[in-house]
Design a protein with these regions (language model features):
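Exported/periplasmic cell-wall-interacting domains
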Residues: 26, 68-71, 89-190
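Post-signal peptide N-terminal segment of mature Sec-exported envelope proteins
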Residues: 27-50
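Bacterial signal peptide processing site
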Residues: 22-24
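C-terminal motif of bacterial Sec signal peptides marking the signal peptidase cleavage site
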Residues: 17-20
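Structural motif
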Residues: 41-43, 78, 119
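Electropositive
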Residues: 57-89
Length: 190
C-alpha cells in the first residue's frame, strides 16, 4: 500500500510539472481602456481611464442584435478583446481565416467585402453574447467604407482601415467592449 501511495504522489508531481512547463504566460489585460459601441448611433467611443480619447463611425449587423449561431447579428453586452491580429499589415490587406493573403483591396472596391487591415477578435463575457468568439465576431477593417455609419455587416463591427489601424495601436488584449442598443449619450452616463 505505501508503494502505491508513493507512486500516486510521483505521478501527481510529474503531471503538475508537465502542466507548468506547458503554461504560456499571457500579457496582462488592458484595464485602462474601454470601447463603447452604440448600435442606434453606429458610433464607437474609446475611453482611457474613463476619459474619452476617440470617437469613430462604425457599421454593425444589418440583421440587428443577437448571438445565435449563423444569425449574422451583432451580439450586445459586455465583451473583451480576446486577440489582436494584423500587426504591421498595410491598410486594405486582406485577412482570410485570420491570416494575410498578400492581397490589398482599396476602399470601396466594387464587389469586394473581405476582412481587411486589422482584427480585434471579441469574446463574450455574458450569457447573451457567449457565442461571440466561436462566431468569429470581430472589430475589423472593411473595404466597404461608404457603408460605415449604417448597419451593413454580417455581425462584426466594421471600421474604416485608417480608423482600425489607429485604434489597434492604442489598445491591448483584454480591453473591455460594451455594445448596446442605446445612444452613446446614455452609455457615457454610466
Amino acid at each position: 500500500m505505501p508503494i502505491m501511495k508513493l507512486r500516486t504522489v510521483w505521478l501527481a508531481l510529474a503531471a503538475g510539472l508537465l502542466s507548468a512547463c506547458q503554461h504560456v504566460p499571457q500579457a496582462p489585460a488592458d484595464t485602462h481602456h474601454q470601447l463603447l459601441i452604440s448600435i442606434p448611433d453606429q458610433q464607437m467611443v474609446l475611453l482611457e481611464d474613463g476619459a474619452e480619447q476617440g470617437r469613430w463611425p462604425v457599421s454593425t449587423a444589418r440583421r440587428g442584435v443577437g448571438d445565435e449561431p449563423d444569425s449574422y447579428m451583432t451580439p450586445a453586452g459586455e465583451l473583451e478583446v480576446a486577440e489582436k491580429i494584423g500587426d504591421g499589415l498595410a491598410p486594405g490587406s486582406v485577412l482570410k481565416d485570420r491570416k494575410p493573403t498578400g492581397e490589398i483591396v482599396g476602399a470601396d472596391a466594387p464587389g469586394r467585402d473581405p476582412v481587411v487591415t486589422r482584427i480585434l477578435w471579441l469574446r463574450g463575457l455574458e450569457a447573451r453574447n457567449r457565442n461571440a468568439y466561436q462566431r468569429f465576431i470581430y472589430i475589423h477593417g472593411t473595404p466597404q467604407e461608404s457603408l460605415i455609419g449604417q448597419p451593413a455587416s454580417y455581425g462584426c463591427i466594421r471600421m474604416r482601415s485608417a480608423d482600425i489601424t489607429g485604434l489597434y495601436a492604442r489598445i491591448g488584449a483584454g480591453t473591455r467592449v460594451r455594445i448596446e442598443e442605446q445612444p452613446l449619450s446614455e452609455m457615457l452616463r454610466r
